[in-house]
Amino acid sequence: RHVQGWWADGWDLLLTPTLAAPPLPIGGLYGDQGDGVDPANPMAPSIRSGRFVAFTPQFNASGQPAINLPLHWNDAGLPIGVQLVAAYGREDLLIRIASQLEAAAPWADRHPT
């Protein structure tokens, strides 16, 4: 509800990170990661995943229009995503902005190193 008030105040977009940390290596949600999560707990991957994707679930669950774009790459060549969120019914704005960003900094041919 709080976010919905931003659109009424005249904001066009909300900008958040896609992930709460850089991309994990394969298997990074399993085993002993030294994060206090018991690796024997069958829910350990879900617990870690919830911490990792803290910015996207509320928009997925609510149907709020959002788009995630790979706008930066770290030193390992992994994409760092940015999430843009718009008001209900403003998918057109997200698609236009995404198109402009991709034209300015294409990513289709970028691959992790």
Where are these regions (language model features)?
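Serine-dependent amide/ester hydrolase catalytic core
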Residues: 1-61, 111
